[in-house]
Amino acid sequence: IFLPEKAQYSYLVNLPEDQDIGKALVEAMELIEAQVPMLSGALPKEYTRFEPKLLRDLLRIFNRDALQNANGDVFGRIYEYFLNKFAMSGAQEGGEFLTPPSLVRLIVNVIEPDHGIVFDPACGSGGMFVWTGYFLNEQGTEPSKAVTIYGQEKAETNTRLSRMNLAVHGLE
């Protein structure tokens, strides 16, 4: 996926101080959603409510050399980390729970989903699909060529989290 310039990280992190970073981030999210239909309506757009300094500081933190030069699925792992923290901080109300990654990994390793359809009737944040992708990658198989994923979720917030999780991990 090649993003328009105004949606690219380098553009946002180097945005002049006199420009509204909150509005620029909202525009970037809209451009990404237009480019990647799977993310339509899933990305957050409330950036204008945050202090510009906070937004710029966060962009700079993720712009450090260590992150830019990291190998593997670093941003996917970062996303999972914050998703887990979000779930543990009380976002599991209403009977919705994040299945611990260790349990999801165990399930995937037991069923060994190497072809066909992977269906999760309560997919939550999409962890089963992500770990299926990890499993297939470890086997030297391209996930999108080996399996088709289907998920169902009653909570709209979880649906958005799942779509973002899949996108961050390169799964469609």
Q: What residue spans do the PLM features occupy?
A:
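Conserved S-adenosyl-L-methionine
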Residues: 93-172
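Non-catalytic, mostly N-terminal accessory regions of nucleic-acid modification and defense proteins
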Residues: 1-114
